[in-house]
């Protein structure tokens, strides 16, 4: 990261002169060359390398739109080529040249920095061999990336990837390589969009296209959403609807964890500070909108990112809102989003096998469907069963492939809830959420919830030996200790088990997520605990049976049944569900 403590001092030494930089075209990419900005030659030897990776930085200093890009590069070179003071009082040793290969200014103009065929430099400690360094002007922990900068960054990355045969999968932020916050939170959140050539376009983006906008034009709108209701550019669906002159946003509804995703217990009604609109909690006393709540609503919109497990509560909220829409003759629009853990893996006991899939209870633990597909299935299955069905419109995604996990969609990850910090957490969730039905900790209260098996009385080494004996695909284990806290990532959560107590734990890691079967892993984990700790292990029967939608698993474990025997018991029911599911897949 380009960090200097006395940037104003350095800029004061700019040579003010008239410059009409010639901009050249390179494969349709406009780049201001070193010659254009009157670069000095390197002052010492530079190390050649072969470009293999693309790494994004920010300058870490406030944007300076009034200064030309030529002057900025001259100042950067002056700073780089001599010993210079840093913000922390240390002295940066001289570099041969500007540290970055490309510089993107506030105007979106791109300038050539160091020759791309030579290694760059950094104030942080990482191996720069092969890294093409792109710096974007600004401090994106405090500032927003400008649209002009974003468009230029996309074009530049596309050019470099094509010209030097560099996979987009190699794109990373400086913070992925070293201990730093660079390139800042706003820019870093957008990097996934650079990794795929054709990112998924979510339903929220398509809502404003001509094909769909008439569904909401001049309508009074109620929105069910939370902090995940963001478009890839960082704009929130609520703000877009509130600001649009052709729509009238009248009511907001929030799910579990609230409309801002910062609450971990029952949520109360409130007012949205930004819009001044009332926010009705659908995870407190009220779980389904009432007729009174909907009297000023012409159309209901649902836009929330789910993770793909039945016991993640957002899809239950969606179904209840869908029921309310049907009962009150209000059109219901679902803005589709990816299934975070992919749309292929379907597994787990089916709550009411053989019956129409009209409720959440009829789903297996992992259903392999998007929220739009689920809404379609619930609606049509309800209609077949003589239950009220909604006037449903699913706005589908573009470029979505159901075998892709969330990090393959090109969409920025936004933690869907306080304890769902990463995609790895989401991958383990179908397995280790079952520990909520026991007296063990699943890791809530840590920065890796659902990635641990922990309790004061377990012996991690022997538990790992037992788990390894099952030879499960895609998972590894190691011993550790955890201390669950009530504050996680700045949010106060419901008090976790063993709060403030350091306890032994087994930490799990994904080694092959494509072949990892999370539901089966959950059964094997419960079996291992029952086998090794029959006296210490306690079932929380209502919770465990509620998660599994059956008491048969618990009873079988108590009877000493083997995991594969238990897993086999739901296979026929799963086949029946898959046949129903296949009718409603949109992708």
Language-model features, listed with the residues they occupy:
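Conserved functional hotspot residues or short segments at active or partner-binding sites
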Residues: 454-568
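Structural recognition of the beta-strand scaffold that forms the well-ordered cores
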Residues: 52-58, 99-105, 109-113, 131-136, ...
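Conserved anion/nucleotide-ligand pocket segment
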Residues: 355-429
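Glycine-rich, aromatic-lined ligand/substrate-binding cores of catalytic
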Residues: 400-487
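Glycine-rich, charge-decorated loop segments at or immediately adjacent to ligand/cofactor-binding or catalytic sites
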Residues: 260-265, 333-355
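Glycine-rich oxoanion-binding loops at beta->alpha junctions
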Residues: 265-297, 309
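Bacterial Sec-dependent N-terminal signal peptides
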Residues: 1-23
